[in-house]
């Protein structure tokens, strides 16, 4: 199969062996895959990422002297099953997955592992229990955004905001936009969005942000304090 491989701090397209699903694994065909900002960091600063992960007990234990196929924001199609699988989803079913797999008893981060290829390849092996079928005819390209959208939703849930608080979203890249969408869905607002990019500010407004700030012209913190009605002592005043 063909894959876009990270090799010697470059991305090269080359042939590699099609992975064979082992116990509890599913062979899938990649239909769409996003490029995460972390992929760019791994390409340019991979050694720093690995070192930081080792120091903090993280999961980035990839060997950069060997080939790595990145890609963890994907939508794929079920092709075949390995041994000891339930085979609940029929071949041809479109799926997303948690970006983690258990390969031959070893936990691997999809896209940041030497053990299994990520979504920058034509085929992947994924853990059956991690699969999420794509619902309701959702377009494949949209389904591939499941992982970054989940990051935004998780951030909003972790923040545990109440209806009296005003969120300030600094940075309106994919995850920032996902945060705005999740905030809008939960009914928390007004939402203040900040970015230097005019295009991203436009997207933030489309996603539901109520106040759009260009930090070149306006202090986001002063705007937030005024809109949220915080006094000079940092005390939250009622929002009418």
Map each language-model feature to its residues.
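Conserved hydrophobic/aromatic beta-strand scaffold that supports enzyme active sites
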Residues: 3, 13-15, 75-77, 94, ...
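N-terminal Rossmann-fold NAD(P) dinucleotide-binding loop
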Residues: 176-177
């Amino acid at each position: 199969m063909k894959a876009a491989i990270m090799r010697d701090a470059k991305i090269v397209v080359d042939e590699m062996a099609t992975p064979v699903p082992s116990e509890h694994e599913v062979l899938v065909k990649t239909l769409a895959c996003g490029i995460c900002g972390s992929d760019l960091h791994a390409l340019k600063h991979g050694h720093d990422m690995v070192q930081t992960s080792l120091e903090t007990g993280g999961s980035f234990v990839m060997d950069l002297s060997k080939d790595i196929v990145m890609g963890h924001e994907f939508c794929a199609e079920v092709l075949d099953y390995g041994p000891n699988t339930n085979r609940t989803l029929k071949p041809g079913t479109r799926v997303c997955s948690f970006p983690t797999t258990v390969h031959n008893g070893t936990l691997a981060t999809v896209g940041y592992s030497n053990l299994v290829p990520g979504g920058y390849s034509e085929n992947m092996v994924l853990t059956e229990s991690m699969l999420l079928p794509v619902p309701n005819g959702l377009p494949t390209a949209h389904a591939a955004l499941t992982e970054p959208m989940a990051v935004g939703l998780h951030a909003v849930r972790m923040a545990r905001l109440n209806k009296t608080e005003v969120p300030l979203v600094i940075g309106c890249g994919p995850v920032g936009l996902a945060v705005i969408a999740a905030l809008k869905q939960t009914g928390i607002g007004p939402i203040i969005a900040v970015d230097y990019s005019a295009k991203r500010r436009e997207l933030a407004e489309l996603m539901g942000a109520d106040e759009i700030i260009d930090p070149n012209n306006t202090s986001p913190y002063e705007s937030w304090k005024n809109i949220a009605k915080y006094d000079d002592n940092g005390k939250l005043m009622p929002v009418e």
